A protein has these predicted regions:
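Structured, non-membrane catalytic/scaffold regions adjacent to prosthetic-group chemistry
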Residues: 2-201
Length: 201
């Protein structure tokens, strides 16, 4: 009885691993806090640019969430700390017809995230992971974490959040990966979502 009531924790097609594997499209860009800027742009009333001290002054949160990469590994219970995405949405007054957030990163990576997933209470811009300052290869100084989607949407080395009413596909989305990427629906690829095409993301 108890067993049948257990909530399934691992999304379909995934396997547990102990540590997240570092996945990067290129070399890890250096994190220089003195010239760090976070830009919030697009369809907003008040576009802003924040330096590192302004980022640090924002309200903070922490979450513990599983992390699912589309290449089929999942890591249990990573603790992320940082700024809730909702704070940033309020700060710039995002227009009501915004549907997507295009995230741009210092390594040239980008990803587009549906606004409902981006705005969830467990989504954040993290500067700490499992109790320590984010390691360079995990996205320092600041990475997006959207735990309800595959990990390719959790962009590292974030520089800009552009709020859009019309979708603009990011790096992996231009290469056939799913617009949304919900691991529970196995939204891996746009065509043939559960396909066996070799996963790069
Ligand atoms: N800027 C940037 N962010 C990125 C990537 C990348 O190549 N560049 N790779 C993505 C992919 S495919 C995954 S699985 C996760 C991996 O996070 P990790 O390297 O911290 O384990 O980062 C995502 N964010
Ligand atoms: Mo990934």
């Amino acid at each position: 009885m108890l067993n049948t009531m257990r909530i399934k924790r691992l999304p379909p097609g995934q396997s547990w691993v102990e540590e997240p594997m570092v996945y990067d499209i290129g070399p890890v860009p250096p994190a220089r806090l003195e010239d760090y800027r976070l830009r919030l742009s697009g369809e907003v009333t008040k576009p802003i640019e924040l330096d590192w001290s302004e980022v640090q002054a924002l309200p903070r949160t922490h979450v513990r969430r599983d992390f699912h990469c589309v290449t089929t590994w999942s890591v249990r219970g990573i603790v992320w700390e940082g700024i809730p995405t909702r704070i940033l949405i309020d700060r710039v007054s995002v227009a009501p017809d915004v549907r997507w957030v295009l995230v741009r990163c210092r390594d040239g990576y980008s990803t587009d995230v549906p606004i409902d997933a981006f705005a969830r209470r467990d989504a954040l811009l993290a500067d700490r992971m499992n109790g320590s300052i984010l390691a360079p290869e995990h996205g320092a100084p600041l990475r997006l974490v959207v735990p309800c989607l595959y990990a390719w949407k959790s962009a590292k080395y974030v520089e800009e959040l552009e709020f859009l009413s019309e979708r603009r596909p990011g790096f992996w989305e231009q290469r056939g990966y799913h617009d949304r990427g919900d691991p529970w629906r196995e939204e891996r690829f746009r065509a043939n979502p559960r396909g066996t095409k070799e996963a790069g993301a």
